[in-house]
């Protein structure tokens, strides 16, 4: 049985892709009224603008009105996934090779549940990180959550754009 977040993702993802956006995350915040927060990113690595979020929000709102997946009243928030975006799909790790990432695990691996390092490669459901001077192999299924890290190197690249 799919969660409501997965059902929402299933009905909006194709439309967002057609618009040039990647659906990063769907999550609920608050109680009454609920807030449906949807994070998007650009498929072509451009920055997400306020206009992009507005355009995506209108499309998502129309789809959710037709699909009627959410029973109670809710507010819709569409935002950029940001510079420290979450990595929620295995494919994300290949897209962000050589980027710094923070990973929190569901259980201990080598006595730790948190790792930070550069993504070396991602293949066969495994993430290879360079943490300080050692390489760490993490099974993707062990990852509870992961986010990119805003490093000085990334910040300098952004300033040049």
UniProtKB/Swiss-Prot annotation:
SUPFAM superfamilies: YhbC-like, C-terminal domain (SSF74942), YhbC-like, N-terminal domain (SSF75420). GO terms for biological process: ribosomal small subunit assembly; translation. It comes from the Bacteria. Transmembrane segments: none annotated. Gene3D superfamilies: Ribosome maturation factor RimP, C-terminal domain, RimP-like superfamily, N-terminal. Its main location: cytoplasm. Keywords: Cytoplasm, Ribosome biogenesis. It is found in: Cytoplasm. Belongs to the RimP family. This is Ribosome maturation factor RimP. It comes from Rickettsia conorii (strain ATCC VR-613 / Malish 7). The gene is rimP.
């Amino acid at each position: 049985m799919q969660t409501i977040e997965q059902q929402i993702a299933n009905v909006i993802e194709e439309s967002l892709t057609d618009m040039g956006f990647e659906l990063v995350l769907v999550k609920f915040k608050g109680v009454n009224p609920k807030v449906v927060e949807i994070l998007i990113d650009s498929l072509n690595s451009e920055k997400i603008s306020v206009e992009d979020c507005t355009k995506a929000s209108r499309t998502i709102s129309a789809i959710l009105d037709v699909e009627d997946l959410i029973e109670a009243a809710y507010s819709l928030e569409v935002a950029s996934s940001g510079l420290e975006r979450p990595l929620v799909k295995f494919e994300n790790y290949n897209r962000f090779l050589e980027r710094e990432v923070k990973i929190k695990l569901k259980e201990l691996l080598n006595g730790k549940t948190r790792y930070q390092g550069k993504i070396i490669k991602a293949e066969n459901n495994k993430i290879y990180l360079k943490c300080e001077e050692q390489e760490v192999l993490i099974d993707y299924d062990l990852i509870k959550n992961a986010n990119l890290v805003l490093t000085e190197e990334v910040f300098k690249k952004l300033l040049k754009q």
